[in-house]
Amino acid sequence: MSDPQRREFLVAAAGIASLATLSGTQPAAAGDPSFMNNVPDPVAAGKELPTFKFALEKSEGKVIGNSFGKEATVTQLPISKGIAGVSMKLEPGAMRELHWHATAAEWAFVLEGRVRTTVFDPAGYAETNDFEPGDVWYFPRGHGHMLECLDNKPCHFILIFDNGYFSEFGTFSITDWVGHAPKPLLAKTFGLPESAFDSFPKDEVYFARGKIPPTEPSVPLEGWKLPPETHRYRLLAQPPHGTFQGGREWRVDSTRFPISKTVTGVILDLDPGGVRTLHWHPNANEWQYVIDGDVSVTLFGSHGRFRTEQLSKGDVGYIPQGYGHSIENIGNRPSRMLIGFNTGVYQTIDLSNWIAANPLDVLATNFSQPPELFEKFPHRDVFIAAKDGPGK
Ligand code: MN
Ligand code: MN
């Protein structure tokens, strides 16, 4: 062994030793990001790839009145350790009460109706925003917030959390806390008689129900203290990030929406027969929700493992970080998907682009083909292909 080789060997050996220590003492657990890169995830380590599909909108979820929250966590979809999602509908006058998520940031996309949110941060800033279909919000992990339906018609939105376990030990609601805190403690905290809390709810309300909110929100007790970074981004009000023969994509990460440090969101439209071509994401898991249409999603998991799932409107899919995949519209009308990544900076490696970037002799040897064959391959990243192949 030469000296540089020996040095590399020693560094690698030290890495294996520390990995063994880690895996020997600690199974992969919620909030432990190490499982994504180092410790094999038992859910995805079997001979066959597990299912990566869950029929979210067909599930029952939590229903109060005409409002609901349906969730996809590791309980419903065991492979989805990095990201959880919720479909939530609020009836007019309903509010998802003041709460926070101890172990997840919240990213959302509005499908129908209008929503108002107020979010409060540790610097003492609060922002109240109104949202329309196509708009996005992001609340950093642990920041207090509420969501309420505006107007006389229901609203429907999809929430994405950067932790697949978030539901089990993640949601802290204000009524749950106040309802269980001793009255003398509440009296001292707020400078009120204990009796002031007699008729407060005793248990978590979750969906509070009241009047339809005013056109303009009423002023908080301490007035408005607006944060330096907004929590709202109007995704579909922008032109698409990329337009191709076969489809188009809108994308927002922290480069355009600075507060969104841990989530990237995408709206992917595919024409019939269109394909988001074979690719992987080096730095993030991918969570998919079909807004409309029928798609076929493939997953490549190494060691010959390959799995295909068909997703339709209301279904959820999940692609682990670094796994190869593709999405094809197999219906006869356009498809639209909401896709979330647990990263603030979007990255992709597309197979077409990787091939185009390698020396021809490498490709020839690798595939046992004449080098001239590869001249016919695309000389660029395809990203989205149309029904009859890559556009110009
Ligand atoms: Mn929330
Ligand atoms: Mn992808």
Placement of each model-derived feature along the sequence:
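Mobile, glycine-rich extracellular loop/lid and propeptide segments
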Residues: 97, 107-110, 116-119, 128, ...
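Glycine- and acidic-residue-biased ligand/ion/polar-headgroup-sensing regions
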Residues: 102-122, 281-302
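Ligand-binding loop in jelly-roll beta-barrel domains
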Residues: 141-167, 321-347
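Short histidine-centered beta-strand/loop micro-motifs
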Residues: 97-101, 128-129, 148-149, 277-282, ...
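A short, N-terminal "cap"/entry segment at the start of jelly-roll beta-barrel domains
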Residues: 22, 27-87, 185-271, 277, ...
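Short acidic-glycine-tyrosine-enriched beta hairpin
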Residues: 122-138, 302-318
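N-terminal secretory signal peptides and thylakoid transit peptides that target proteins
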Residues: 1-17
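Histidine-centered metal-chelating micro-motifs
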Residues: 95-97, 116, 136-137, 141-146, ...
